[in-house]
Each structure stands twice: as structure tokens, then as C-alpha cells.
Amino acid sequence: MNLLMGYTYLIPILFASYLIGSIPFSWILVKVFYKRDLRSVGSGNIGATNAFRVNRGISFLVLLLDIFKSVLVILILEKMCAHKSIMYLTGFTVVLGHIFPVWFLFKGGKGIAPTIGVVLSINIKIFFLFIITWAVVFMIFRYSSLSSIISIISSCIYCAVTENFNSSIFYIAMSIIVLIKHRDNVIRMINGTEKKLF
């Protein structure tokens, strides 16, 4: 695996991870089963939350598939005995592909599902912290965006404290981008116009 750490091997792996991350499962499933363009529905975001506005069942499938994108890539690297920091970097690339897919002029989802896949595959403690935080915040406020934001922040802090620098820096960078993608949600919450999921 030492050879894999060289740039010759790492660059194509990161490129492949980006392409896997950029697969727009939400857009594909909504288009195939409902003949609708998800970009013209609700917030226009091609993610699981917006797919929920079309059909709850399809949104759950989208969530699982988007999580699986990260899980698949990281499990392959784990089989190749990759260092944890490389797993975080590759997971980061999957999330970038999800958020900035080349197929839609780099306008994609907000990165929550593939981020969940990253921590599920690498650090189960961060995964449970993320899920529990999301569930508690959602039960109180009913805002998916607020739940995601607080979950990202709490998991980011925990990762920074418990992981080494080389690993945590990639998760922190990934978290910052995911938070930036939620800036419109923050503005709507401040203005009182953010819609609750249900």
C-alpha cells in the first residue's frame, strides 16, 4: 500500500472518487419513477431532503445510495490497507463530487448523506454522535437543515479532538464546505421563511 500513497496512484483514486460522488441518484430516481426534474421541485436542490418533497420512500432510497457512495470508496481503500488520513481525504473527494457534480454545472446536493457515509466507514463514534445529534435537534425544531448544521459542527469538534491532525483536517475542510452550502438555509431561518420538513 506504500506505493498507493504515491501521487501516481492517489490522483486517479481521487478522480474516481469524485466521479462516484457526483452520481446524482436523487435526480435519476425522481426522473425515472416520477418523470420530474428535481431541480424544479421545492428548493431545487438535488438531495435526499428535496426528494422527500416528491416521495418519502424515494428520498429514503436516495439517502441510502448517497451514503453508500462514500462507504463503497472507503471500504475499497480499507481493503487496500490505506492510512486513515487517505480514507478521510478520499471521503472528502466523494463529498465534493456530490456537492459539485460536473453533470449539473457543479450544482449538486449539500453533502450530508455522503458525509454520514464517511464517518460510518471510518469512525463509528462520530457516526453515532452525528445521527443522535441530528435526531434530537430535529425532534425539537423540525428543521432538517438546522439538524444537519448542528450535527456537522458537533461531529467536526469531536473529530478534531479525537483524531490526529492529518485525518481531522480533511473532515474539518469537508465540514466547512457542507456548512457553506447551508448558508441559504441559515438566512431563511433567521428571516423565518425556512420550511420545516413536516
Curated annotation (Swiss-Prot):
Enzyme Commission designation: 2.3.1.275
Enzyme class: transferase
Molecular function GO labels: acyl-phosphate glycerol-3-phosphate acyltransferase activity
GO CC annotations, alphabetized: plasma membrane
Key words, A-Z: Cell inner membrane, Cell membrane, Lipid biosynthesis, Lipid metabolism, Membrane, Phospholipid biosynthesis, Phospholipid metabolism, Transferase, Transmembrane, Transmembrane helix
Catalysed reactions, semicolon-separated: an acyl phosphate + sn-glycerol 3-phosphate = a 1-acyl-sn-glycero-3-phosphate + phosphate
Membrane topology type: Multi-pass membrane protein
TM spans (from-to): 10-30, 57-77, 86-106, 118-138, 160-180
Pathway connected to this protein: Lipid metabolism; phospholipid metabolism
Predominant localisation class: membrane
Disulfide cross-links: none
Superkingdom per UniProt: Bacteria
Entry's localization field: Cell inner membrane
Pfam families: G3P_acyltransf
GO BP, sorted A to Z: phospholipid biosynthetic process
InterPro entries assigned: G3P_acylTferase_PlsY
Quaternary structure (record): Probably interacts with PlsX.
Family from the record: Belongs to the PlsY family.
NCBIfam families: glycerol-3-phosphate 1-O-acyltransferase PlsY (TIGR00023)
HAMAP family given in the database record: PlsY (MF_01043)
Role played: Catalyzes the transfer of an acyl group from acyl-phosphate (acyl-PO(4)) to glycerol-3-phosphate (G3P) to form lysophosphatidic acid (LPA). This enzyme utilizes acyl-phosphate as fatty acyl donor, but not acyl-CoA or acyl-ACP.
Protein name in UniProt: Glycerol-3-phosphate acyltransferase
Gene designation: plsY
